[in-house]
C-alpha cells in the first residue's frame, strides 16, 4: 500500500489536473450511486448483466475523446462490460429520458456543494436569488445508419434538450431531453415548471416568453428575466421612462400587465433597451419582462442581467471544442441524448476543477488565462497511464468523502498546478481571404515551387 501511495503522490505532483479529474469522477459517478439512480428512474429497462454505471464508463471514453467510437470503447472495456457489443448497443439505444435527465441532476447536486466548499463559486448575479439560465440545444444531425434512414436524403435529427445552468456554480444542474428534433421547446415547459423553486430567478430568451411559462414561474412564487416575444399578449402599457444606459444602449422601463392562465391580471416590469447597434436579425430595440422588484435590481441591472444569458452559449461552445457529446453514429434518439448528457456531466467535472483553480490562484487569473482545451488535453494525455499505474482501491475513498473533505483534497492538488502550462493562446484578428483566382485552369499546384518563387524557400 505504501508503494501505491507513493505512485499516487507522484502523479498528484506531476499531473495534478489528471488526479483531480479522476477524483471528481469517483466522487460524482460512483458505481453504486449510478446503479441506484437507474433503478429509481428506469421504467422499461432492467439491469441484467450490463450495469448502468458501466454504460456511463463506456460512453465517457467516447465523449471525452479517449476512444474514437463506442465499438472501440467496448473493445477496451470488454471484460468489465461482461456482455456482447450487440447487447451494449441495444441498451444504449433504449436508455430512457428519465434516466438521462436523472444522471445530469444527480451529478449537479453532488458537485454543487463541492464548488461551495472549495470557495470557487462566482458572486450571485442578484443577491438573495438563485439564478438559473435555461436554453435549448438541438443535437447535430446523425449518419443514416438506421434502416428507416438509409433512403432518406434529409438530415436526421436525433433530438434536443433544454439545459439549465447555475451561473454561480457554473454547473449544468438540469436537463430536459426530447427525442423529437422537430418538437417546439414549449412542449417541455410543463416539465421545467415542475422544477421551479421559490426564489429562483430564471433567465431565458424570447422562445420562453409564453403566458403559461411566465405565470407559472410567478405562481411558485419565483422570478424571471425573459426577453419579450413579439406575439406575447400584453394587456396594458404604463408610461415609458428613461433609466440611463447599459453596455448595449439606452435603457427605459414601464409597467405592463397580462392575463395569466386563470384569467388573473398579472403586473410586471418591461425593460426596453434601444440598442446602439442592431442585432443580427435587424432589431433596434429589445424588451425584457421581469417581476424582480426594482429595489433588488433596477432597470439597468435587469438589462445587464439578460446579457448573462450568453453564459450558457459559452458552455455549449466548450462542449463543442473539448468533448464529443454529439456522436454522428448514434442514430437512436435515446443513445444520442444519453451521449449529450455524458458531455454535460464531463463539463461539470471540469467546472469543479476550474472552481478549485479559481479558489487557489484567483478568479481573474484563471478565467482570463486558463484554456479549457489544454485542461481537457492534459487529462486525456495522462489518464490512461495513470489508470494502469494506480490500482482501483486507491480511488475508492473519494466516493464517500463529504463535500468539505473533497474540497480540501482538490485545493491540495491544485497547489501543484503550473498554470503557465494551460495558458490560453489568443489569436489575432482574422485576415480576410483574398479571391482565389490564380492557377484556376490547373487541378493542383506544387506548394514548394510557389514558396521558391516567393523567396520563402531556399
Residue ranges and their predicted role:
Residues 71-75:
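Residues within the helices of the helix-turn-helix
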Residues 1-70, 80-95, 102-110, 114, ...:
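Single, function-defining residue in the core of a domain
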Amino acid at each position: 500500500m505504501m508503494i501505491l501511495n507513493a505512485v499516487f503522490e507522484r502523479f498528484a505532483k506531476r499531473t495534478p489536473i489528471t488526479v483531480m479529474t479522476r477524483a471528481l469522477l469517483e466522487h460524482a459517478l460512483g458505481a453504486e450511486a449510478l446503479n441506484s439512480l437507474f433503478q429509481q428512474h428506469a421504467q422499461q429497462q432492467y439491469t441484467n448483466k450490463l450495469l448502468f454505471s458501466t454504460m456511463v464508463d463506456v460512453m465517457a471514453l467516447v465523449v471525452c475523446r479517449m476512444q474514437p467510437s463506442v465499438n472501440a470503447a467496448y473493445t477496451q472495456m470488454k471484460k468489465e462490460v461482461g456482455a456482447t457489443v450487440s447487447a451494449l448497443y441495444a441498451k444504449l439505444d433504449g436508455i430512457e429520458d428519465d434516466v438521462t435527465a436523472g444522471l445530469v441532476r444527480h451529478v449537479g447536486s453532488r458537485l454543487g456543494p463541492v464548488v461551495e466548499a472549495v470557495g470557487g463559486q462566482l458572486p450571485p448575479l442578484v443577491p438573495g436569488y438563485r439564478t438559473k439560465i435555461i436554453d435549448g440545444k438541438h443535437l447535430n444531425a446523425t449518419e443514416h445508419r438506421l434502416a428507416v434512414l438509409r433512403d432518406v436524403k434529409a438530415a436526421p435529427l436525433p433530438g434536443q434538450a433544454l439545459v439549465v445552468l447555475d451561473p454561480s456554480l457554473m454547473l449544468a444542474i438540469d436537463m430536459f431531453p426530447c427525442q423529437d428534433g422537430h418538437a417546439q421547446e414549449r412542449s417541455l415547459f410543463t416539465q421545467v415548471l415542475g422544477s421551479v423553486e421559490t426564489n429562483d430567478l430564471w433567465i431565458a430568451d424570447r422562445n420562453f416568453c409564453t403566458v403559461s411559462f411566465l405565470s407559472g414561474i410567478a405562481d411558485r412564487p419565483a422570478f424571471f428575466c425573459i426577453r419579450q416575444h413579439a406575439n406575447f399578449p400584453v394587456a396594458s402599457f404604463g408610461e415609458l421612462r428613461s433609466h440611463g444606459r447599459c453596455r448595449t444602449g439606452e435603457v427605459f422601463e414601464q409597467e405592463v400587465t397580462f392575463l395569466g392562465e386563470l384569467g388573473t391580471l398579472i403586473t410586471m416590469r418591461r425593460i426596453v433597451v434601444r440598442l446602439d447597434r442592431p442585432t443580427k436579425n435587424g432589431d433596434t430595440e429589445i424588451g425584457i419582462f421581469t417581476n424582480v422588484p426594482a429595489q433588488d435590481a433596477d432597470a439597468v441591472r435587469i438589462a445587464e442581467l439578460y446579457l448573462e444569458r450568453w453564459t450558457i452559449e459559452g458552455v455549449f461552445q466548450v462542449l463543442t471544442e473539448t468533448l464529443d457529446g454529439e456522436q454522428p453514429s448514434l442514430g437512436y434518439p435515446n443513445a444520442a441524448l444519453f451521449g449529450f448528457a455524458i458531455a454535460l456531466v464531463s463539463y461539470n467535472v471540469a467546472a469543479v476543477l476550474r472552481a478549485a483553480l479559481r479558489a487557489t490562484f484567483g478568479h481573474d487569473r484563471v478565467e482570463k488565462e486558463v484554456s479549457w482545451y489544454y485542461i481537457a488535453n492534459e487529462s486525456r494525455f495522462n489518464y490512461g497511464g495513470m489508470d494502469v499505474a494506480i490500482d482501483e482501491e486507491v480511488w475508492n475513498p473519494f466516493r464517500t468523502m463529504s463535500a468539505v473533505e473533497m474540497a480540501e483534497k482538490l485545493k491540495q492538488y491544485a497547489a501543484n498546478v503550473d498554470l503557465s502550462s494551460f495558458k490560453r493562446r489568443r489569436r489575432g484578428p482574422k485576415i480576410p481571404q483574398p479571391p482565389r483566382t490564380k492557377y484556376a485552369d490547373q487541378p493542383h499546384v506544387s506548394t514548394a515551387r510557389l514558396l521558391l518563387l516567393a523567396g520563402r524557400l531556399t
